[in-house]
Amino acid sequence: MVKTQRVVITPGEPAGIGPDLIVQLAQREWPVELVVCADATLLTDRAAMLGLPLTLRPYSPNSPAQPQTAGTLTLLPVALRESVTAGQLAVENGHYVVETLARACDGCLNGEFAALITGPVHKGVINDAGIPFTGHTEFFEERSQAKKVVMMLATEELRVALATTHLPLRDIADAITPALLHEVIAILHHDLRTKFGIAEPRILVCGLNPHAGEGGHMGTEEIDTIIPVLDELRAQGMKLNGPLPADTLFQPKYLDNADAVLAMYHDQGLPVLKYQGFGRGVNITLGLPFIRTSVDHGTALELAGRGKADVGSFITALNLAIKMIVNTQ
């Protein structure tokens, strides 16, 4: 890395395990400066509950970034709306969570931060606070005015991107249009090159129907939509293999010769990845004008403040963000 970069982190729901994980992250040295967008008392109280050392140093945007030393974090303060009891949701803090996301996103857009890593949020409590919120991905897409974003989850061994995300099954076939596939594959291909450093990405594409339609006998979306799009993009030089049946695609015969898989819908691709690497997975938002990674788990309210939360996914998310920063320099 040519110079030390700043990575901004949002802990997510303050009553969940996000603050625990941030404190655990701080117990090791990092080659980047970790700027945590959070309430100071929340972090110091949680560190005390866990019996771990934590020193907060103020964020100084005009000073050169410094590699993070063990036991310290750089704090970009955002005040809680209500005091926090670990494991107990407080509706007003839904506003606090969104404020942290907005500040972190804006900092990435204006060049303060090289990447953003998000901890788990509780969507229900944010909506209960009167803020329409469907998820991090949609929030950052709207705030950054990105034309289109793509959700991808990854482990060390496997990357799975989604053509559609949080849609009911009955709506998926209608949502998979030529325009959508062109856009999603273009973003996936571009970000594999620019953010992952893969010169010529090799992408496996799932069919929509069982057996990838069985030649039109189990649905015609492959013939009508997916195959024509893949043929057009192959003619442009993209290395695309598919459409392949999803029940046979996830095996070494195919995966050993691929850099990513494009699944047509959420529960087609993600169960395999989460079974293969749960606790080590990372959620990546492709198509944003900045690097964003996230943990692959929820708030785990029942574990907050008890010292039992597994920091593995957060460490993987941070390490991947650092690699992506290097690739984009």
Curated annotation (Swiss-Prot):
Note on cofactor: Binds 1 divalent metal cation per subunit. Can use ions such as Zn(2+), Mg(2+) or Co(2+).
Compartments, record wording: Cytoplasm
Catalyses which reaction(s): 4-(phosphooxy)-L-threonine + NAD(+) = 3-amino-2-oxopropyl phosphate + CO2 + NADH
Record EC number: 1.1.1.262
GO cellular component: cytoplasm
Residues where substrate binds: 136-137, 274, 283, 292
Pathway: Cofactor biosynthesis; pyridoxine 5'-phosphate biosynthesis; pyridoxine 5'-phosphate from D-erythrose 4-phosphate: step 4/5
Pfam families: PdxA (PF04166)
Entry-linked InterPro entries: PdxA, PdxA_fam
GO terms (BP aspect): pyridoxal phosphate biosynthetic process; pyridoxine biosynthetic process
SUPFAM superfamilies with a match to the protein in the record: Isocitrate/Isopropylmalate dehydrogenase-like (SSF53659)
Residues the record lists as binding a divalent metal cation: 166, 211, 266
Database matches in NCBIfam families: pdxA (TIGR00557)
Annotated family: Belongs to the PdxA family.
Assembly behavior: Homodimer.
Function summary: Catalyzes the NAD(P)-dependent oxidation of 4-(phosphooxy)-L-threonine (HTP) into 2-amino-3-oxo-4-(phosphooxy)butyric acid which spontaneously decarboxylates to form 3-amino-2-oxopropyl phosphate (AHAP).
Name of the protein described by the UniProt record: 4-hydroxythreonine-4-phosphate dehydrogenase
Protein source organism: Escherichia coli (strain SMS-3-5 / SECEC)
Gene that specifies this protein: pdxA
